[in-house]
Amino acid sequence: MIPDDLPISPFLEEICSTLKNSESRFLILSAETAAGKSTAVPPALLNAFPKKILMLEPRRLAVLSIAERISSMLEEETGGICGYRMHLENCVSEKTRLEIITEAILTRRLQNDPALEDVSVVVLDEFHERSVHTDLALAFLKEAMQLRDDLYVVVMSATIETKRLSEYLGTAEKPAPVIKVPGRKFPVKVEYAGNVSPSKAVLDEVKKCSPGQTILVFLPGIFEINRVKEELLESGMPDENCRLLILHSSIDFKEQKKVLEPLSENEVRVVLSSAIAETSLTVPGVRTVIDSGFARLNRMNITLGMEHLVTERESLFSAEQRSGRAGRLAEGKCIRLWNKNDVLNLETPPEILRSDITSLVLECFAWGVKDFSALNWLTSPNMAAWNEAVKLLKELDCIDEKNTITETGRASLKLGLHPRLCKVALCGFSEAVLNYSNYGRSSVQVQRRFLQDLENRLKKIPERVKIPVKEKSLAVLNGFPDRIARHAGKGLYKFPSGRVAHIQKKEAERISVFPEWIVVPEVDSGDSEGCIYSYEVLDENIAGEWLKNRLKTEVLVDFENNRLCKKEILCYGKLIFSEKKLNVSSEDYGAAVCAKIKREGLDFLPFNAEAESLLMRAAFYSEQKGMENKAEKTVLSENAQEWLLPFLSGQNSVSEKMVFDALYWYLGGAEIDREVPVQIVLSNGKKRKLTYEKLSSPEDKTKLIIRPVLEIIIQQIFGCFETPEVMGVPVLLRLLSPARRPLQITDDLANFWSNTWPEICKEMKGRYPKHKWDYKISCDE
């Protein structure tokens, strides 16, 4: 039975009826922390709809916790009416109608049954986390709903910006309905402690904490959790009445579950947690939250094909989620370890823009989508990231040259593995897969279950797809072909991408002779130099044999120490194996300049004021026409061979005139001169020079737009009554006194003459009595 004392209880009937009557069949539920949405909404939907209800949760511990809580509420065993599914662990039965599932399970289910025939409603909980899986599932669900008119979706979160989402789920004219529910029953007092260390804050709060209460401490990641734990242990914590627990996705699942155990009456509990405890989990007895203000995020370096773990300020939404943990049971407090005036971003960028999307792209190919623009995304993937993922999938034989998913690609989906690990598994090295998967740090029991499950799945894969390999290192190389690295001296290794990385310090200290070749499954790209966390040593013969058919011969023309050089190299990416100097020809100068531009940008080219003006005018033209801006300097750097190389033929230097002429030809200078002039004829007959500048948009001060600007002594615009325009955009007038001091800035001349000019005119007449001041008559001053 659903409790009637939850903040969300009075809204349940409205939620069900609004969803049933929603024209888009979507509903957004914005329910504050502790409203009871995860517990109460699924059973309410169960009573209102005939088929199954699926609720997606981003974390395994939340899946288990919610399934057990709902089952208890329904006075059932877990696996009865309410059950759960996650990788390696299911608890469902024939009578199960409500399933709490992890994200990857929903994707698999959609791939196997795109119409979800036995499901009435899919609930996407904690949607604000915007994982890759959730965004993909939502895009797939929008297509699945076209196959059935009785499939519904509820999007739930405590902190979410609803306007854009409701228009995406519906239309701009008819957005999806939004229901907002108040949550927290108890106030939370927020205190700002400044730069106090987390361990000191914990020790201070433990002294004030009553028995039977929990202090929940949010830290960026496992490194900080372990460091604070050590500091607390050194200070004498915990004692017989204080229990210290940690919560992080990398620790064993059994250890994670300990934080959900009930407290004893005499116990004070301190839980050191990552962001895993922000949502869905109800940690018993939390009355105090200590928030470090930081989060650990993955950032994908697309060019290098490596991820970089960064510690960043948490978002405002995240800070609200964290503080809300303290007000679920009684009046609580949140101690923020930063200053009140510190500025936080509203939300964290979605994972789809910052993480590895290789698996997502493979799922899309299996769905029948080969171009990301063919799916209706809430946030589209980055085009460069998509293209790099496709390139890697081709290297891994998951996609063929015709952009068709292969048997290897389908095997990856069946095995439930990242395409890289799938290749390792198909080589017959399941133990290596375990080591480089999330299960590598789990208990022995879980590891055995993972390996058994993988072996069972591998038996169903056709033998022709499997790869007979004897060496573990070669198996890993098959899955990480872009991560082969060569020793570059002093413990540094160079990758085909050009990135250099060092082996983790503790490991490096144990090595007497660094191997020539390694393959690196786990590496952080770093800011300027990466860090290698795990690797396999490659026998030089194996490396040589593997590279043999992958080496390419390239001719490079470039500047070295300001001298023009030409050489032929044998390489794999940026790993160079041999090079031979060649004679420089008269045509090589242009190629070298273009190579330098692509590498270093346009700064070394001689740009005069005329060329800079042309670039700004071309950008303005593109902006008004809604076209791609070919005048963007990053675009010009990439395309130097297209616009500059024809003008460099037979030359041995670059002049200002050459750069201008090349840009004028490439950007369509004649059309730009016609539409975006450098000089304008005012309605009083005077010709004046215009400039084009990047300025804040009048509608949105945070956005920069290009505007035509006219700086002019005010008498020179007498006799003009309407604001001049360029391509329909009003010219911004900077009106000056006879001494060229600023008087007014306006893009509405008629309004200026009527309302502002009379006061300015009085002052000008007093200061400059010999000048003419009738704005209605053209003046030669």
Predicted regions mapped to residue ranges:
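Charge-dense polyanion-binding interfaces
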Residues: 123-124, 239-243, 247, 252-256, ...
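Short, solvent-exposed loop/turn motifs
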Residues: 185, 404, 492, 500, ...
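Amphipathic alpha-helical packing elements
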Residues: 493-494, 500-503, 604, 672-706, ...
